[in-house]
Amino acid sequence: MNISNIKIMLLGSGELGKEFIIAAQRLGIHTIVVDRYKNAPAMQVAHESYVIDMLNSDALEQLILAKNPTYIVPEIEAINTDSLVKLEAHNFNIIPCAKATKLTMDRQGIRALAAQQLNLQTSKFAFANSEQEYLDVIQSIGLPFVIKPVMSSSGKGQSIVKEHNEIKKAWDYAQNGSRGHAKGVIVEQFIDFDYEITLLTVRHKDGTSFCDPIGHIQKDGDYRFSWQPHTMPDTALAKSQEIAKEITDALGGYGVFGVELFIKGDEVFFNEVSPRPHDTGMVTLISQNINEFELHLRAIVGLPIPDIQTLQPSASAAILLEGDTANASICGIDKALADANVDIRIFGKKEIHGKRRMGVVLAKAQNTHIALETSKQALAHIHLTK
């Protein structure tokens, strides 16, 4: 295999894409990245970068035809997936495949696959395309429930509704968080689960591999902390791996899939799946012998994937900062790095208008509890320059 002849085009240039591009650069692979704005994180480390509206089919197809990449790797959902389906039919290699990208871009498609075709256990759910339909389905779902836009990213528009006086506010919040022109929502019965995990699942030429389960804490629908390994009963872990393999086999293609699951005792409920590295999986930058971005790259280009090992208990903490500036300056990194068990990634984003994830703290320790506390202590030092 001569990987120096490979060209990878990344559609989306966020922080996860940046780590993926770094992994590709280390192996001498030519990298091209695309996003809707200049100087996005992955653009800062790629050979070539382009700014286009990836929902515009003409712009997207013209760029791909002009650059003729070996692999096209979607990093975000805001892409014209019909174009990817068409390009795949003309022998372009979409990762993991156009079907997976299209199905997982909206919650209605993936929930139909999981619950109706594969009969995986999920929470009770219903879809609504108007506020009146939303009010109607609440009657059958009952309180408390979770509402999410059918199309959104990074937890935008998600909320848990526990009281009747929160119902209208939750609808409005979902509409504001929805991507594009989609107004639909999914309403799910709230599961009083014991914990939730991400099971990073790698489909590659030699089969399917699993990383150790990653525990995480979400707030406002977005990841704040994660840790690995998350200790769980053997029965629940086996069920989790079975579900993850079933859903990823149905989607097809090669690469890393982030499978989100709720665990209650030995019961496992499917929640969501992303056909790409997962934000909670940033902990693997410090915890594993091969991190999730390297695993994604290896699976895509056909490199060997040996045993995936968790080297030590580890945790990550999202650096979520709040402000209103076009030139963010971050302080406190020196204090955070005074601990030998701490590492940091700053993503290179300059603009903040409200809250924005600007980096991640990584910590290792003799157990995940201490690693999580260490990450929180380091996080407390980091802030915007006043």
Curated annotation (Swiss-Prot):
UniProt-listed Enzyme Commission number(s): 6.3.1.21
GO biological process, one term: 'de novo' IMP biosynthetic process
Presence of the UniProt keyword Ion transport in the record: no
Subunit structure: Homodimer.
This protein's name: Formate-dependent phosphoribosylglycinamide formyltransferase
Role summary: Involved in the de novo purine biosynthesis. Catalyzes the transfer of formate to 5-phospho-ribosyl-glycinamide (GAR), producing 5-phospho-ribosyl-N-formylglycinamide (FGAR). Formate is provided by PurU via hydrolysis of 10-formyl-tetrahydrofolate.
Gene3D superfamilies referenced in this protein's UniProt entry, alphabetically: 3.40.50.20, ATP-grasp fold, A domain, ATP-grasp fold, B domain
GO cellular component: cytosol
ATP-grasp domain segment(s): 112-301
Chain's gene name: purT
Residues holding N(1)-(5-phospho-beta-D-ribosyl)glycinamide: 15-16, 75, 279, 349, 356-357
Reactions listed under catalytic activity: N(1)-(5-phospho-beta-D-ribosyl)glycinamide + formate + ATP = N(2)-formyl-N(1)-(5-phospho-beta-D-ribosyl)glycinamide + ADP + phosphate + H(+)
Pathway noted in the entry: Purine metabolism; IMP biosynthesis via de novo pathway; N(2)-formyl-N(1)-(5-phospho-D-ribosyl)glycinamide from N(1)-(5-phospho-D-ribosyl)glycinamide (formate route): step 1/1
Entry's family note: Belongs to the PurK/PurT family.
